[in-house]
């Protein structure tokens, strides 16, 4: 019986289709490991735990998917919020400390959208779950799309949705109140479309 099982195992492993699947999987894991290697905190965790970064993230991701999908122990909401907060918070801090301004739109837009989702939850989570039972699954996938450097969904959302919408608001404010805005003197923001210099912007350009 043991010999028969071993033969089946060998036949499966030697199957060209199985080998192709293994090669694709190994390639994806290697690509994920290379991407995760960009983050010092993950490299430190790998050294401390002796668990490869890619396998740790895959295991954590799979566990999170199960907990969110089946809402085990009522953890769907906190885990979804943790996923949507932890990495973006870390990357936002890096963006603040960076002298470049390339990531500002990405993370400012992300926090606006993430905050809006949580505002909707706070006002009527039961109604949301009644109409969309898989809400936390969709929310988690959406926030992952927003945050990942490979997709930069928040930046896409800014240029294709938020920016045109704000442009319409600006044009209406110009036609109704003119271009002068006393608030711009205090905040550095002008609804007419110009932004006054601020100390924060000056620091990031130095």
From Swiss-Prot:
It comes from the Eukaryota. Residues 177-206 are annotated as: Disordered. Pfam families: TB2_DP1_HVA22. The keyword Endoplasmic reticulum applies. The chain crosses the membrane at residues 53-72, 75-95, 106-122, 127-145. The keyword Endoplasmic reticulum applies. Residues 1-52, 96-105, 146-206 are cytoplasmic. Residues 73-74, 123-126 are lumenal. Keywords: Endoplasmic reticulum, Golgi apparatus, Membrane, Transmembrane, Transmembrane helix. It is a multi-pass membrane protein. It is found in: Endoplasmic reticulum membrane; Golgi apparatus membrane. Required to generate and maintain the structure of the tubular endoplasmic reticulum network and the vacuole. Induces high curvature in membranes and causes membrane tubule formation. Involved in membrane/vesicle trafficking. Oligomer. The short lumenal loops between transmembrane domains 1 and 2 and between transmembrane domains 3 and 4 may impart a wedge-like configuration, thus deforming membranes. PANTHER family: HVA22-LIKE PROTEINS (PTHR12300), RECEPTOR EXPRESSION-ENHANCING PROTEIN (PTHR12300:SF161). This is Protein YOP1.
């Amino acid at each position: 019986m043991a010999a028969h099982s071993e033969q089946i195992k060998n036949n499966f492993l030697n199957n060209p289709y199985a080998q192709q699947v293994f090669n694709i999987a190994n390639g994806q894991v290697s690509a994920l490991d290379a991407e995760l290697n960009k983050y010092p905190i993950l490299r430190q965790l790998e050294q401390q735990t002796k668990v490869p970064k890619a396998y740790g993230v895959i295991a954590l991701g799979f566990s999170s998917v199960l907990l969110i999908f089946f809402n085990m122990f009522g953890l769907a909401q906190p885990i979804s919020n943790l996923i949507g907060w932890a990495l973006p918070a870390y990357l936002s801090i890096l963006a603040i400390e960076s002298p470049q301004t390339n990531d500002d739109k990405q993370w400012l837009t992300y926090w606006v959208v993430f905050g809006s989702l949580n505002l909707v939850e706070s006002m009527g989570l039961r109604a949301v779950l009644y109409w969309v039972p898989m809400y936390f699954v969709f929310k988690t996938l959406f926030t992952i799309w927003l945050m990942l450097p490979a997709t930069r969904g928040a930046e896409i959302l800014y240029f294709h949705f938020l920016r045109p919408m704000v442009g319409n608001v600006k044009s209406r404010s110009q036609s109704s109140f003119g271009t002068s805005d006393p608030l711009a003197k205090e905040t550095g923001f002008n609804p007419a479309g110009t932004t006054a210099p601020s100390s924060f912007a000056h620091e990031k350009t130095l």
